[in-house]
Amino acid sequence: MQAYGRAFAHVYNKRWTGFAHRVGPLLLEFYANTTGGEAKQSVLDLCCGTGQLALHFLEQGFHVTGIDLSEHMLQYAGENASAYVETGQAQFVQADAADFSLDRQFGLIVSTFDALNHLESEEALLGCFRSVFAVLLDGGIFVFDLNTRAGLMRWNNIHIDDGEEAMIVTRGFFDGQGSRAYTRVSGFIRAANGQYDRFEETVYNTVFDMAWVRDALLQAGWRDVHVAQLDALAAPIAEPEMEDRVFFVARK
């Protein structure tokens, strides 16, 4: 998994928080309606980025641990949730999602914004599932999203975001012969001194077969697994490969 740099973390914190604001309320509602969910007030945000999703749970009284490989993402997460960090309600830990361990367990573990597509192989994803299983309470829920092959095939595009604080060029490319899609993000961001700093980062998404992912979860130990859409997390869908993005829901 990639560890993103300081400039990219800055852009992410400023420009790419919308998905967390969208999924946060829906995840909260889904978890509150699961058996025992309201009593397990501990959440692990896996690949937490700058902590925007963690804030949704913190504001509702949950204790949240965030994991990310990027120290720069974690710095922003700590700043964004500083009031909760000071009281001990939140903590942020640098670790690799493919292989990690913690000294506590959680009732809910989430990973969103196709973070697990950033793992480089099936072996790495299976390692992630095993690590998650070990820190999930019995009866706990693991919810994560993945971009499908159909969704990643739409990445052949270019987008320019030009404003006073930043100029960002995003170029997407899907490797039809391989199993990855790439996004090259480059541009300039205005620093505190008024000057503009150049940055460049390439983000990749690995294509995973949705049937294999389900089987890997069962292999890792989950007893109940289904695939859903964001707006109906409790309702299984029959053809996940037909969607651009899907959510896996697994109960231990």
Where are these regions (language model features)?
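A short acidic, Gly/Pro-enriched loop at the edge of an enzyme's catalytic core
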Residues: 98-108
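A short SAM/SAH-binding and catalytic strip from SAM-dependent methyltransferases
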Residues: 107-123
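C-terminal lobe and adjacent flexible extensions of AdoMet/dcAdoMet transferase-like proteins
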Residues: 208-252
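Conserved class I S-adenosyl-L-methionine
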Residues: 1-47
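A short glycine-rich, Lys/Arg-flanked "PGG" loop and its adjoining helix->strand segment in the class I
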Residues: 126-138
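SAM-dependent methyltransferase
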Residues: 143-214
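Class I SAM-dependent methyltransferase SAM/SAH-binding core
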Residues: 52-99
